[in-house]
Every structure is written in structure tokens, then in C-alpha cells.
A protein has these predicted regions:
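Core beta-strand elements of the Rossmann-like FAD/NAD(P) dinucleotide-binding domain
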Residues: 7-10, 131-140, 252-261, 272, ...
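Flexible, glycine-rich terminal cap/loop adjacent to redox cofactors
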Residues: 10-39, 44, 51, 55-65, ...
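Short hydrophobic core segments
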Residues: 13-15, 121-122, 136-146, 180-181, ...
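Hydrophobic Val/Ile/Leu positions in short beta-strands of Rossmann-like dinucleotide-binding domains
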Residues: 14, 35, 179-181, 187, ...
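Glycine-rich dinucleotide-binding loop and its adjacent helix/turn
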Residues: 50, 145-200, 204, 232, ...
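A Rossmann-like FAD-binding core segment of flavoenzymes
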Residues: 115-118, 122-130, 197-294, 359, ...
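FAD-site-proximal beta/loop scaffold in flavoenzymes
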Residues: 159-175, 256-333
Length: 461
């Protein structure tokens, strides 16, 4: 290979600097480590995903609270949105500094055993990588390259500027109007962000229902709220054109939608398809995920994978948990620890917030459980009165015979916080029949909605 350097060998090679970057703890100080990152240090979550989006969500929440203040007897309004100020606060003052600091640390004197390569990595043989002009081999290789937005047609081949979550937050100016394509959590969060900040939002989805994976009670209520809040169009795009003022989208339903900008949030795909994995004997699932066993091992001995590139759960807290398992397994090959894939929660930072863990009611019935179900309204507890909440619910699904909590589903203020105590109940297999009365619940605080939901479950005599 002309121009190639001789192979450099390392004890450990890590591809990707999201969760994978947390593997080199002090226990690895005696190991030679290569970190390969073609993009920005920190991965999706830090740079273009969960963290900056929630910083935008919080600003939108505050703006929306002012809009809805009349129900509390207040007259409030947002005079203006300083888009440049938000971008500077989120990225220049926070995210970019953290990403830059992370790279400087890995390249610096504090980690002399680590070498950083800033090129795209691909396999050219078993446990052998090419990154730019460098050939890199390793005793162990960890693939933690994450995922990327999916752009279906006609967006993928269009010359019209199409935005994804990876650039929408860094727009030079806030659009007066925005088309959001998609019906999943990314689409719904950004629809909330831009509508909350005053952009006119049109949501385009190919099916009638948003967030279809949710329990039916939450899904139906959220869809009612979304349809009241956003201009919703159902259909699949047949044409995308650039106009003098922005974009024009034509749907197979005949609808034509125009806006200053368009965001496509129709899903994500694992970043394993451009790494020539087959040259190393690494197999993939049909959906593009790298095949791993319960310990994170791929089909090539000594090669591991974690996070979005291999996991069925595209969630940062899952990637972090998988990273801890792989980290342990690298250090203790005689005592392998499985990936922790039980009781995985998820939250959606829309308005209202949504959080869920475990089985939906339909799933529990399909699995043959004799279920007991309670749907508790936020508006029926004291703090719900204080907020004048009329949409929030806490739904619990339990096994009537054993008191085992099978699923918890919350939609309303602070849902992502309220769900945590129910995750604990499931992880430690607590008898939910004793859960409400074996502890104090602060009155009149919002967790009383969970207490009342538990007390409302009906049990076998």
C-alpha cells in the first residue's frame, strides 16, 4: 500500500468517542490504547443529541409556560427569542468546550498511554484497521461508532437543503416556519422546541399516529394534544422543491406544505455499514446492527461492540451501561458480565413529558398475565390542582396475582423524574402491593400521583 505507514499495535483500540471514550479508566493505565474518532469528540449525545436538545427543550418549556400562564391567573409573554444567544449558550459556552476539552485530555500529558487518530476507520483484516494512512492492530478492539440520521427519498437525493438533528440546532437564524417530517421521539421533541420558541410548525407523518410504540392510553392522549398544537399533515413526500422563501413539500395525499426550512427526523441507522466489517469476520443483523452476544463480543474474537452500532436500544443510558459491561469484560475475561438489558426506561422531552418502563398493557396481556391496571390523572392530586393540569396521567400495569409491577407509563410534568422510583421497584422486584404504604409520600408533592396510582390497583382476594 503506497503511502501507508507500518502497522502500529495497541493493547486496546476504541473506535468512537461517545460512550466508548469512558472505557479507559485508571485500570487501563498500563495498556497502550488507540482512540479513533473521525468527527467531534463526545459522540452524538453530547454534540447533536440528548444534551443540547434538552437545553433547547428547557428554553421552549419556559417560553410555553409564559404562553399558558393565563390559566394560573397570570399575564405573561415572551417579548423575543434571542436565537443567537441560545446557540451561544448551548454550544459555544458549554457543548463545544466540553468536546474540545475531552479531546485535549486524551491527547495530553495526563494520558500518555493513549494515541488519538482523527480519521475514518475501516477493517482490512481480522483485528486490523486502516485509518487514513495508518494501519492499526489491537489485541482487543471496541466498536462504539453510534448511529446516524436516516434520510429516505426524496430527501436523500434532493438538492434542497434538508436538516437533521445534527445541524438544526446550529441554524444561523430561527426559521419563521418549519416542516418536521416524522412521528417518533426526535420529531416530536423538535416540534415542541420550535413551536415553543415561536416558529410555526407543520408536522408531516406517513401514518395517523405519533409515538406508536407507547401504551395506547398515553399515545391517544398525546396525539390529541399534538393535533391541537401543530399543523398535522398525513402522507408521504412525492416532491421537494426550493422556493424563494424556503421549501415546498408535496405529499401523496395532495397536500402541499411550504416553510422556511425542513427537518427530517424519520429514524436513525447504526454506523457499521461503512467499516468493511466482513473483512474481519464481523457479522451484522439485517437492520444494520453489529451482531454481539450477551457480553458484547462480536463474531470476531477480540472485537467488541456497544451502543447504537449494535444495541437494540438506541438510548444513551443503555450505551453507558453496555460500556461499563464491556469495560469490566476487558479487564476480567475470566468473569464476564452480561449486558444489562432489563427494565430499560425511556423518556421523551415533549410537552408534556413522557416516560415509560416495562410492558404496555397490551404487551402484558399478550404475554398471558392476569393484569391489574390503574390510570391516575395528575389533575386529581393536590399538586396537579396547583398546576391546573388537565392532561397528565400515570398508568401502572401489574400482575394481579403476585403484585409484580410489569410496566409504568407517565405523561405529564416531570415524568422523566417521577418514573425513577418505579424503575427501582421493578429492578429490585418489590411487591407493589406494599410499595405505597411502606414509605412516606411528601404531601402535597407531585409523586402523590404515583402513590394514588399504586393504591388504585385491584388485587386478587
Amino acid at each position: 500500500m503506497v503511502g501507508m505507514t507500518s502497522a502500529q499495535h495497541f493493547d486496546l483500540v476504541i473506535i468512537g468517542t461517545g460512550s466508548g471514550n469512558s472505557i479507559p479508566s485508571p485500570e487501563f493505565d498500563d495498556k497502550s490504547i488507540a482512540i479513533i474518532e473521525k468527527g467531534t469528540f463526545g459522540g452524538t449525545c453530547l454534540n447533536v443529541g440528548c444534551i443540547p436538545t434538552k437545553m433547547y427543550v428547557y428554553a421552549a418549556d419556559v417560553a410555553l409556560a409564559a404562553r399558558e400562564a393565563t390559566r394560573l391567573g397570570l399575564s405573561a409573554h415572551v417579548d423575543a427569542v434571542d436565537w443567537d444567544g441560545i446557540v451561544e449558550r448551548v454550544f459555544h459556552n458549554r457543548i463545544d468546550q466540553i468536546a474540545r476539552g475531552g479531546e485535549e485530555y486524551r491527547r495530553g500529558e495526563e494520558t500518555p498511554n493513549i494515541t488519538v487518530f482523527d480519521q475514518h476507520a475501516r477493517f482490512i483484516g481480522p483485528k486490523t484497521l486502516q485509518a487514513g494512512d495508518d494501519i492499526i492492530t489491537g489485541d482487543n478492539i471496541v466498536i462504539a461508532t453510534g448511529s446516524s440520521p436516516v434520510l429516505p427519498e426524496p430527501y436523500a437525493s434532493s438538492s434542497v437543503p434538508v436538516h437533521t438533528n445534527e445541524d438544526i440546532m446550529r441554524l444561523e437564524k430561527q426559521p419563521r416556519s418549519l416542516i418536521v417530517v416524522g412521528g417518533g421521539y426526535i420529531a416530536m421533541e423538535f416540534a415542541h422546541v420550535f413551536d415553543g420558541l415561536g416558529t410555526e410548525v407543520t408536522v408531516v407523518n406517513r401514518s395517523e399516529k405519533f409515538l406508536r410504540f407507547l401504551d395506547e392510553d398515553l399515545s391517544s392522549r398525546f396525539n390529541d394534544i399534538a393535533r391541537e398544537r401543530f399543523d398535522v399533515r398525513i402522507g408521504t413526500a412525492t416532491a421537494l422543491e426550493e422556493t424563494a422563501d424556503g421549501v415546498r413539500l408535496t405529499l401523496d395525499s395532495g397536500d402541499v406544505v411550504e416553510a422556511e426550512a425542513i427537518l427530517v427526523a424519520t429514524g436513525r441507522q447504526p454506523n457499521g455499514d461503512q467499516m468493511d466489517l466482513s473483512t474481519s469476520g464481523i457479522e451484522m443483523h439485517e437492520d444494520g446492527r453489529i451482531k454481539v452476544d450477551e457480553f458484547g463480543r462480536t463474531t470476531c474474537e477480540g472485537v467488541w461492540a456497544l451502543g447504537d452500532v449494535s444495541s437494540p436500544y438506541m438510548l444513551k443510558h443503555v450505551a453507558n451501561a453496555e460500556q461499563r459491561a464491556v469495560q469490566h469484560n476487558l479487564l476480567h475475561p475470566e468473569d464476564l458480565r452480561p449486558m444489562p438489558h432489563e427494565h430499560i426506561p425511556a423518556a421523551i422531552f415533549t410537552h408534556p413529558q413522557i416516560a415509560t418502563v416495562g410492558l404496555t398493557e397490551a404487551q402484558a396481556r399478550e404475554e398471558g398475565y392476569d393484569v391489574t391496571v390503574k390510570v391516575q390523572n395528575f389533575g386529581d392530586v393536590a399538586y396537579g390542582w396547583a398546576m391546573e393540569d388537565s392532561t397528565g396521567i400515570c398508568k401502572l400495569v401489574a400482575d394481579r396475582a403476585t403484585g409484580k409491577l410489569l410496566g409504568a407509563h407517565i405523561m405529564g410534568p416531570q415524568a422523566s423524574t417521577l418514573i425513577q422510583q418505579l424503575i427501582t421497584a421493578m429492578v429490585y422486584d418489590l411487591d407493589i402491593r406494599e410499595f405505597a404504604r411502606s414509605q412516606y409520600w411528601i404531601h402535597p408533592a407531585l409523586p402523590e400521583v404515583v402513590e394514588n396510582a399504586v393504591l388504585g390497583l385491584e388485587w386478587q382476594e
